[in-house]
């Protein structure tokens, strides 16, 4: 054997050993149960309204657009007939009127530094869009029509380098069907809010087979599933208080943490301005603890509701509580219609860096995820658990020294996996069956 040939084979063997070692390095040296106490701080950054395919469909190695195209998810109208072209996108003349009936790149028409129209993301509509797993009515049951089939260039996203460096979950689902309000409440309580005597005008009407006749915020049996605002202050000026949700009394993860002496806070952009009655970008339906009696004005629990500026200060000073929920405000949260993807993600990157570069970064886990899919297509059929969901697949990124590096985690997770993690880490009782049974990111984390 020539020296050149010998060196070639030696290099191949070295590469194989190195790759094998890298794979082994992805396994914890200690168990999840023994290692999880190493995490002293959890930071959940809760962005808005994008499906996995919409943002990370082009992520190499993930279950994305290549598989979606193989599935040939032709969109059909409400009668089940295929569209010749995607239905015309309203409220924005940048999109052509004859888009082919398939997935398309949004960036070629509206760059990611500009907001697109909002896309329909409601409780009953999400189920109609999924269409019993056919995934073929996202355009039909959508006010923005064909826009539902759009996606962004993944590598151009500000969060892409972070997703590539750490763990990207490509099998993570929003816990509840539909929109932001419902999934925010579910994130902290693993249950649906109740309003048995809601105004009739707010109640949805379904036929005997469960088909939607008239949409509404409240189910016929009294659960609040679409956007409502809390009767607890602050609420928007000139609100009709008869149409504001009465304070809820079921337990939340905040209650569990406070009972156990675990420090925590929910930080919202614009909170201080909203409380003071000043002009603000605070989103009233994105403040889930505000829906509960335990957090109304004058309560002890209210002290845990803070402004995003307080989070930034605490992150830089190293005074973060054990558990932080961080909620960017309108214009900065990626919500279509009011926020653009690119600058919103730039803001999220700054929040992440504030944590990782601060004194608490060495023992922190950051989870960046989205409340829901925003009405955008995703090709993966959600698992069936109960009447509430899960809904569509959404992105989730685990970041920090305990997240596996350069890893795609295809383990089934959902929004309340975050609750499950908190409960496992700090020894808390589950709130409901859903969080009790959810995987607490066991396969995404690594401990030494």
Predicted regions and their residues:
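N-terminal pro-sequences and low-complexity stem/linker regions of secreted or lumenal proteins
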Residues: 22-448
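Sec-dependent N-terminal signal peptides
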Residues: 6-14
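C-terminal motif of bacterial Sec signal peptides marking the signal peptidase cleavage site
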Residues: 17-18
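Positively charged n-region of N-terminal signal peptides that target proteins for export
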Residues: 1-5
């Amino acid at each position: 054997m020539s020296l050149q040939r010998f060196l070639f084979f030696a290099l191949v063997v070295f590469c194989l050993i190195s790759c094998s070692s890298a794979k082994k390095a992805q396994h914890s040296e200690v168990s999840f149960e023994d290692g999880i106490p190493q995490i002293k701080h959890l930071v959940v950054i809760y962005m808005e309204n994008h499906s996995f395919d919409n943002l990370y469909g082009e992520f190499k190695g993930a279950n994305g657009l290549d598989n979606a195209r193989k599935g040939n998810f032709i969109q059909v109208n409400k009668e089940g007939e295929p569209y010749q072209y995607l239905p015309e996108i309203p409220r924005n003349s940048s999109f052509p009127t004859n888009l082919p009936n398939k997935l398309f790149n949004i960036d070629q028409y509206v760059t990611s530094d500009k907001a697109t129209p909002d896309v329909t993301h409601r409780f009953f509509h999400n189920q109609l869009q999924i269409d019993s797993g056919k995934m073929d009515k996202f355009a039909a049951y959508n006010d923005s029509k064909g826009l539902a089939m759009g996606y962004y260039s993944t590598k151009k996203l500000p969060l892409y380098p972070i997703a590539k460096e750490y763990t990207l979950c490509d099998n993570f689902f929003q816990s509840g069907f539909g929109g932001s309000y419902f999934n925010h409440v579910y994130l902290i309580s693993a249950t649906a809010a109740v309003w048995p005597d809601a105004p009739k005008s707010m109640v949805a009407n379904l036929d005997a087979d469960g088909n939607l006749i008239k949409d509404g915020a409240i189910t016929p049996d009294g659960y609040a599933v679409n956007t409502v605002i809390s009767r607890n202050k602050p609420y928007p000026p000139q609100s009709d208080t008869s149409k504001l949700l009465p304070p809820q009394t079921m337990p939340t993860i905040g209650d569990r943490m406070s009972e156990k002496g675990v420090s925590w806070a929910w930080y919202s952009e614009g909170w201080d301005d909203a409380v003071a009655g000043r002009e603000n970008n605070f989103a009233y339906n994105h403040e889930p603890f505000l829906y509960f009696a335990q957090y109304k004005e004058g309560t002890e629990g209210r002290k845990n509701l803070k402004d995003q500026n307080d989070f930034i200060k605490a992150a830089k000073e190293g005074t973060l509580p054990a558990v932080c929920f961080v909620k960017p405000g309108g214009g900065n949260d990626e919500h279509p219609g009011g926020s653009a993807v690119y600058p919103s993600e730039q803001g999220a990157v700054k929040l992440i860096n504030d944590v990782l570069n601060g004194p608490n970064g060495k023992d922190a886990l950051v989870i960046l995820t989205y409340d829901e899919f925003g009405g955008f297509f995703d090709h993966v059929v959600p698992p069936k658990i109960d009447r509430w969901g899960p809904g569509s697949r959404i992105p989730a990124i685990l970041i920090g020294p305990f997240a596996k590096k350069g890893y795609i985690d295809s383990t089934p997770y959902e929004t309340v996996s975050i609750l499950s993690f908190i409960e496992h880490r700090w020894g808390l009782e589950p709130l409901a069956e859903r969080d009790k049974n959810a995987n607490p990111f066991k396969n995404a984390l690594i401990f030494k």
